[in-house]
Design a protein with these regions (language model features):
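Long, low-complexity, charged/polar intrinsically disordered regions in eukaryotic proteins
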Residues: 1-3
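Winged helix-turn-helix DNA-binding recognition segment
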Residues: 5-17, 22-77
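Charged low-complexity intrinsically disordered patches
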Residues: 79-99
Length: 99
């Protein structure tokens, strides 16, 4: 894990801690606000605000695929220890190596 994000002054401690936690979870872990709140002993509201901040700074992207019958499925989280746009510039635009 690159620690550049831990030294950013424009990123809150809450967002830094949540990102560090998310990066340490197994690759097959199913991210959800409820699950992150449970393992971090934080409210779902606190987790939601930290996730929004991580999205704002491009460490997190959430997509909402649709099921075959058109319903919105669970969110798919893409996370990275550097802003995703920087990762894509270095490695191409494939999300394959991202969590």
């Amino acid at each position: 894990m690159d620690n550049e994000f831990l030294t950013r002054k424009d990123l809150s401690l809450k967002a830094k801690g949540l990102l560090a936690c998310m990066l340490c979870l197994p690759p097959d872990w199913r991210f959800s606000i409820e699950g992150l709140a449970y393992i971090n002993k934080e409210s779902e509201s606190a987790i939601s605000s930290a996730l929004r901040e991580l999205e704002q700074f491009d460490y997190l992207r959430r997509s909402y695929p649709r099921t075959e019958d058109g319903k919105i499925a669970n969110a798919v989280y893409t996370i990275c220890d550097i802003p995703i746009v920087e990762y894509e510039a270095l490695h191409g635009e494939s999300d394959d190596a991202l969590n």
